[in-house]
UniProtKB/Swiss-Prot annotation:
Function (record text): Attaches a formyl group to the free amino group of methionyl-tRNA(fMet). The formyl group appears to play a dual role in the initiator identity of N-formylmethionyl-tRNA by promoting its recognition by IF2 and preventing the misappropriation of this tRNA by the elongation apparatus.
Binding residues for (6S)-5,6,7,8-tetrahydrofolate: 112-115
Protein name: Methionyl-tRNA formyltransferase
Highest taxon of source: Bacteria
Gene symbol of the encoding locus: fmt
Residues annotated as signal peptide: none
One of the record's GO cellular component terms: cytosol
NCBIfam families: fmt
EC code(s) of this entry: 2.1.2.9
Length: 317
């Protein structure tokens, strides 16, 4: 008999896991729990989450409570009588009363090798820190943040040019298989969770738009990693003149196919030549590749600088 599941998730990275469970004969997804519709686009029209859209397309009931820990929703979930709840980036903390509803608990897929990088932004934190290995972990949710016992892990190398979006896309796919296998093992009574180690705990809080502003007073490798860590969301940015400019990943001098400026650049100083745009950091300059001026799409940095006619004294701040 298939395991009766409620799937809790919201953004696009949760879709591979949802699809894997929907297509499995061993799992019956009886409902999807997701965050309420959120304003999207220039008009701010409320739109369903990616998980809600997928569920609606598949004819799966969608639950969108504003207060998932309310007594009313706890009772509604209990009426569904799930055996287990699977969670991938749902986006809300779950309290004891809700956690107690399914007999096999709430099983979360988290995109780090716990106990490293507990929190909302584990992929971004791993890239920014310069980690070379990360992964995904399945664990049983407990009230404390990402602290429950572990069922399984899968590892993933972090490539030198990975953005958070690229790495998360790979982890979402490998993590979907891990979550499915974990749920199978729980149903078969062949998996026993192990406590998380007390050592190696690190926290990865959500990154704000303000924190995504580039700090040119840091060394070039740190600047480069931090930009990749917030690409595509919330997106790295800087101010040049009176313009707020979004930045795509940058190139270190050693990784560039074009020569660096002949003179050292202080942090934030800009050098423009015929083929490249460079910005100074606390160590070596970095080369801008793609930038996004206000109200426009991403474009080549050289083309933008040529059209903008930058003041020779212009700085990125």
């Amino acid at each position: 008999m298939p395991v009766r599941l409620v799937f809790a998730g919201t953004p696009e990275p949760a879709l591979p896991a949802l699809r894997r469970l929907l297509d499995s004969p061993r799992h019956e997804v009886i409902a999807v729990l997701t965050r309420p519709d959120a304003a999207s686009g220039r008009r701010g029209k409320p739109e369903p989450s990616p998980v809600a859209r997928e569920a609606l397309d598949r004819g799966i009931p969608v639950l969108r409570p504003a207060r998932p820990n309310s007594p009313e929703f706890v009772a509604e979930l209990a009426q569904l009588a799930p055996d287990c709840c699977a969670v991938v980036a749902y986006g809300a903390l779950l309290r004891d009363e809700l956690l107690a509803v399914p007999p096999h608990g709430w099983i979360n897929l988290h995109f780090s090798l716990l106990p490293a990088w507990r929190g909302a932004a584990p992929v971004q934190a791993a890239i920014a820190a310069g980690d070379t290995i990360t992964g995904a972990t399945t664990f049983r949710i407990e009230p404390a943040l990402d602290s429950g016992p572990i069922y399984g892990v899968v590892t993933e190398a972090i490539r030198p040019t990975d953005t958070a979006g690229e790495l998360l896309a790979r982890l979402a796919v490998s993590g979907a298989e891990l979550l499915s296998a974990t749920l199978d093992g729980i149903a078969d009574s062949t998996l026993t969770p192990r406590p998380q180690p007390a050592e190696g705990v690190s926290i990865a809080p959500k990154i704000t738009v303000e924190q995504a502003r580039v700090r040119w007073d840091l060394p070039a490798p740190v600047v480069e990693r931090r930009i990749r860590a917030v690409t595509p969301n919330p997106g790295a940015w800087t101010v040049i003149g009176d313009l707020r400019i979004k930045l795509g990943p940058v190139r270190l001098g050693a990784a560039s196919d074009l020569p660096a400026p002949p003179e050292p650049l202080p942090p934030g100083a800009i050098h423009v030549d015929r083929k490249s745009v460079w910005v100074g950091t606390a160590s070596d300059p970095v080369r801008l590749d793609q930038i996004q001026p206000p109200g426009k799409k991403f474009m080549n940095a050289v083309d933008w600088a040529r059209g903008a006619r930058l003041d020779p004294a212009a700085r990125a701040t």
